[in-house]
């Protein structure tokens, strides 16, 4: 695992965008694994800027997203379908047929999990998997558990995740309690994993994921076993890692 120190959120975002843009330039038909949440927004903004300048072309890129809320319509402004279009897809020349996300409106968990796993197999190896990390160390919506989940599954969100998501909804009752998530095994098969983290609220998760024991109680810790994992974190997110760096 390689750790890259960033000055702040803007610097973190630019460093992550540099790695993704290099991948797309070197391999125009790259498969990009994409994440949602506040952490990668700046990365998407930078990629869009470079596209608008003519420096990047996404026409042959395929994308697969990590997760989607269970029972949430794509047009809901808090869905991850909406998020991705709002922050990235609608601003670049990506082919809509190459965009892949879980279908949160499929009530049959086994059916949707099997469908999305089949999609992931069909697109081939993910070249770069972009990840944020939750305060409790979750990646995707793989929450702390007694074992690592292998494939796509529907997960019950923990109270800490629900608490962190409250700010996006008008009331607590609207905050989703469940979500479809790509499994740990699938994330680990990506050729390169790129984690972005910013802020003191991510400091514990970064320390435990990078330097703690590998345990499903801290899902991000599995990335220590990946042969090409990069963590880009700002000073605040690295504030508890002083003894290790």
Residue spans of the language-model regions?
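N-terminal glycine-/serine-/threonine-rich phosphate-binding loop
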Residues: 1-32
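ATP/nucleoside-binding phosphotransfer catalytic cores, i.e., glycine-rich phosphate-binding loops
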Residues: 185, 189-245
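Glycine-rich phosphate-binding loop
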Residues: 124-149
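Ligand-binding beta-strand-loop-alpha-helix segment within the catalytic cores
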Residues: 56-129
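Class I SAM-dependent methyltransferase SAM-binding "motif I" and its flanking Rossmann-like core
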Residues: 140-184
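A glycine- and small-aliphatic-rich helix-loop capping segment at beta-alpha/alpha-beta transitions
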Residues: 46-57, 80, 144-153
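Short beta-strand segments
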Residues: 33-37, 65, 102-103, 130-133, ...
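Glycine-rich N-terminal segment of FAD-binding domains in flavoprotein oxidoreductases
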Residues: 26-52
